[in-house]
């Protein structure tokens, strides 16, 4: 019986650059899901400057990892500006929003209680 494909939308056994997998488009938020299981969701985002996602809450802890550019993550009303190479964890259930300070790309990893 074949194994389930747990990571998708990338070529297996080949090196790649995460930021190259998703493109910034003017005024938009683009995403590419790399993995989704009952316990985790891994998604790449490309967010244009001043575009973003309005306030919402996730059912699990979410770690934002900025790959390129600069973005603002507001958690419980407190703004955090992150640049390439920086990360932040959003606690499960915390209201948060994300906005591009410049065009930016991020990897979002959400871990759910199992």
What are these regions (language model features)?
Residues 1-39, 74:
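A short, N-terminal "cap"/entry segment at the start of jelly-roll beta-barrel domains
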Residues 28, 38-58:
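Conserved short histidine dyad/triad with adjacent acidic residue
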Residues 38, 67-68, 83-84, 102:
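A cytosolic small-molecule/anion-sensing beta-strand core signal
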Residues 41, 70-72, 79, 95, ...:
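Structural motif
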Residues 46-48, 58-73:
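Short, conserved beta-strand element in jelly-roll/cupin
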Residues 52-54, 88, 92-97:
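Histidine-centered metal-chelating micro-motifs
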Residues 77-92:
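Short acidic-glycine-tyrosine-enriched beta hairpin
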Residues 92-114:
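Ligand-binding loop in jelly-roll beta-barrel domains
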